[in-house]
């Protein structure tokens, strides 16, 4: 077998609040790299505090790409991400730099590194119909429906993951073909790079939960609710008939803040709901990450030396 001549890239993956941003910046500084965000919330302008978007000081330490691409009333698909990220990575490599892919959106990573199956575009009317059904019957009932038409998808998609349940049923109702079958079809080619996948996750789940809670409290102190109030006050957002159906507003934390500002519950309940939703997101992310069999796992707080060794070995090949 010949030597693999593909350019190198490093993927910094992990659940929310696991320290990906700090690690990505450190690697970019060490390896003369540039960071490519792989996060579906960070593509939206005005979603800064609640998305833990790198701030000006962090961006000054290393170039960042694919932040602030869309307004929050717009949409951005995995296919658009794969095309944009591919162009950015090719440009970074052409300039002799190291691409550092950093984020926690599994669909974006799969689209970029494994290729993307052809798939029908999102249909706002169908999504609204499914959301109305869910409001009446509950997402568990729609998950049971998915299990009847696409058992493989229902096994992969947790009953508490409404966004993916909605997408799977949307694809089936639009085309009559299960999403699992669509995913088997050849589509967009994967990015031609050799990638070291680093997964950051505390060994103790309780530590991650503590980090999630502390980070959310810090976001509140930084003015997260004022950020959401400003979003709601934008004329373009006010004109949206069902803002809770927008991908930007469905982002964890933002949905709970939006509902709270709509008058649902008190401040303590809002905080509890947002922290719970973030923990559920982390759980789903860890489930996806366990399927990344070619990745290496590190606790960012105690495995720094081992992580540095893995990176050194990879770039020296």
Swiss-Prot record:
One of its GO terms (molecular function) is tRNA dimethylallyltransferase activity. InterPro entries: Dimethylallyltransferase, IPT, P-loop_NTPase. Substrate binds at residues 16-21. Keywords: ATP-binding, Magnesium, Nucleotide-binding, Transferase, tRNA processing. Its EC number is 2.5.1.75. One of its GO terms (biological process) is tRNA modification. Gene3D superfamilies: 1.10.20.140, P-loop containing nucleotide triphosphate hydrolases. Its cofactor is Mg(2+). It holds the Pfam family IPPT. ATP binds at residues 14-21. It catalyses: adenosine(37) in tRNA + dimethylallyl diphosphate = N(6)-dimethylallyladenosine(37) in tRNA + diphosphate. Residues 39-42, 163-167 are annotated as: Interaction with substrate tRNA. It comes from the Bacteria. The record marks 105, 127 as: Interaction with substrate tRNA. Belongs to the IPP transferase family. Monomer. Catalyzes the transfer of a dimethylallyl group onto the adenine at position 37 in tRNAs that read codons beginning with uridine, leading to the formation of N6-(dimethylallyl)adenosine (i(6)A). PANTHER family: TRNA DIMETHYLALLYLTRANSFERASE. This is tRNA dimethylallyltransferase. It comes from Stenotrophomonas maltophilia (strain R551-3). The lineage of its organism: Bacteria, Pseudomonadati, Pseudomonadota, Gammaproteobacteria, Lysobacterales. The gene is miaA.
